[in-house]
């Protein structure tokens, strides 16, 4: 894998910011409704909030490059690739005034592997020696964490793992203050119970309408530009844009369903479009009585007109999928064409299998409702009934984790360009259970495992191509739909407005008061 590493070393609020000279920035987004503990969720909305408070040893910046944050340098790796020595920066404090030491890093990883935590991302780090013993309840300490002194430690892993350093740069490995986190217990990540070394601290959080943040007086890095950062929760995409037009928020995402309405409006110069690394797909519960039949899954794929979906419902802001892996991720097979659309063939596949009018339910969040409704119409033409139900985002997250969704529509985005981060995390059999898809193919698992343990980038690419083909074209274990583009709007006075790969990094935002 070629990893690019950077060098280390309401409207009333808006008017008040102008009158008082204070810089107040209000960002509108949907409510993730999963809390802000990044060990227990994979929600990008939660990341966009917690990202301002928490920091890890490393991070992926807006330019998709990994850089040092709490670590002084990139790790020193042993010749056998199994030991990583990391030194922390000295003088770093958490926002509560406590010093960052090796003990906090140790606590963070041990909390991650403690079963009671319910960490959703252990598969990214469970190659650390002793992690599985903790997950199995056989140990309470992480044997692969070796403390050298207050600022230096070693991580021992069981096998060579090419993306290990890359994974250390993800939000899921944010470092927590041991004393404060332990004291908060189950309330960690709820309300204002989130303390980090990041540039902001949470002043208010009612978990329903908004999160208010102010600068961290103990921050070790460059002073932030804002006096106040507000994350305003607005679930309805049309309401969100109305609030933006009325000046009640300064920046928000622009849902693709509304792009046609705004692209030639007075706001056209305030729209920025980006192409992330992810894939949108119809996620299927592969052990469901109806959907466990491969013929049904194949017929579903054949019935969907992806090109039309992209040009009409998505207003041209997407490309029809040809594999589960995004074209920007090594392992995507550029030789593959868009998945076939053939209603007649879909009907024949069902007939050959002796299946008549298969029926299932697709439960989605409000933002995916239009996509699901379009899919419903396509499937109906092939004699497949897909009932669509729109449910609360919080209920959706819980139902997906519990394996209670027959199907749903969502996007899955790696935070850096590596297939392990996009495909292993969702469809490796042990992880597929937690994602509610229950895909299980030993051949696929074997290819993914071999790719994980190889440091040969060319070999990894070929292994991922084979795995993707098995997943999405042989088994139809997932139904890739399209590679979407994302849009956001920002007022002319907002400076440094950028979207990383799905995550809004708001800590660099500034306000030009002279333009308000």
What are these model-predicted stretches?
Residues 87, 106, 122-179:
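Surface-exposed binding/hinge segments that line
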Residues 488-516:
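Long beta-strand-rich cores associated with HINT superfamily self-processing modules
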Residues 101-108, 150-156, 198-199, 226-228, ...:
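Alpha-helical secondary-structure segments
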Residues 75, 387-389, 393-396, 401, ...:
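Extracytoplasmic/peripheral linker and loop segments enriched in polar/acidic and small residues
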Residues 157-223, 228:
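Gly/Pro-rich hinge or "lid" segments in bacterial periplasmic/extracellular proteins
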Residues 185, 216-262, 385:
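Ligand-site clamp/hinge motif
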Residues 292-377, 381-382, 387, 466, ...:
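Append "and occasionally in soluble cytosolic enzymes with long acidic Gly/Pro-rich linkers
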Residues 28-79, 195:
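N-terminal lobe/hinge region of extracytoplasmic solute-binding protein
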């Amino acid at each position: 894998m070629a990893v690019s590493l950077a060098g280390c070393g309401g409207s009333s609020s808006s008017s008040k910011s102008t009158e008082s000279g204070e810089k107040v920035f209000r960002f509108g987004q949907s409510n993730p409704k999963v809390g802000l503990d990044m060990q227990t969720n994979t929600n990008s909305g939660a990341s966009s909030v917690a990202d301002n408070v928490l920091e890890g040893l490393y991070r992926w910046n807006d330019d998709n490059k990994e850089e040092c944050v709490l670590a002084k340098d990139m790790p020193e790796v042993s010749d056998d690739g199994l030991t990583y020595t990391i030194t922390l920066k000295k003088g770093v404090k958490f926002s509560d005034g406590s010093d960052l030491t090796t003990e906090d890093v140790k606590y963070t990883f041990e909390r991650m592997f403690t079963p009671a935590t319910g960490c959703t991302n252990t598969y990214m780090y469970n190659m650390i020696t002793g992690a599985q013993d903790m997950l199995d309840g056989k140990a309470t300490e992480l044997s692969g964490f070796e403390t050298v002194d207050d600022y230096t430690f070693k991580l021992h892993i069981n096998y060579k793992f090419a993306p290990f350093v890359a994974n250390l740069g993800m939000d899921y490995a944010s470092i927590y203050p041991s004393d404060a986190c332990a004291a908060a217990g189950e309330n960690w990540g709820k309300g204002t119970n989130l303390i980090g070394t990041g540039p902001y601290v949470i002043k208010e959080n009612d978990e329903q309408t908004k999160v208010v943040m102010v600068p961290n007086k103990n921050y070790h890095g460059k002073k932030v530009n804002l006096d106040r950062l507000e994350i305003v929760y607005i679930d309805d995409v049309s309401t969100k844009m109305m609030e933006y037009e009325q000046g009640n928020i300064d920046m928000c995402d622009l849902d693709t369903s509304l792009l046609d309405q705004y692209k030639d409006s007075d706001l056209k110069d305030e729209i920025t479009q980006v192409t992330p690394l992810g894939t949108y797909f119809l996620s299927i519960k592969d052990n469901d009585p109806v959907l466990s039949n491969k013929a049904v899954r194949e017929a579903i794929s054949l019935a969907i007109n992806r090109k039309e979906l992209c040009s009409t419902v998505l207003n041209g802001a997407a490309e029809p999928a040809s594999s589960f892996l995004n074209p920007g991720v090594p392992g995507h097979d550029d030789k593959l064409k868009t998945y076939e659309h053939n209603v007649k063939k879909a009907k024949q596949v069902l007939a050959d299998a002796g299946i008549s009018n298969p029926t299932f339910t697709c439960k989605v969040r409000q933002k995916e409702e239009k996509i699901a409704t379009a899919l419903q119409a396509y499937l109906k033409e092939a004699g497949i009934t897909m009932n669509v139900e729109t449910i609360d985002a919080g209920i959706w997250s819980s139902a997906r984790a519990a394996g209670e969704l027959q199907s749903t529509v969502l996007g899955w985005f790696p935070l850096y360009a590596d297939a392990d981060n996009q495909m292993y995390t969702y469809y490796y059999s042990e992880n597929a259970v937690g994602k509610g898809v229950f895909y299980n193919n030993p051949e696929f698992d074997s290819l993914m495992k071999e790719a994980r343990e190889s440091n040969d980038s060319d070999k990894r690419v070929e292994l991922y191509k084979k795995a993707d083909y098995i997943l999405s074209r042989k088994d139809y274990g997932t139904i890739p739909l399209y590679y979407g583009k994302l849009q956001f709007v920002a007022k002319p006075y907002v400076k440094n407005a950028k979207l990383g790969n799905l995550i809004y990094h708001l800590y660099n935002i500034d306000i030009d008061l002279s333009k308000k």
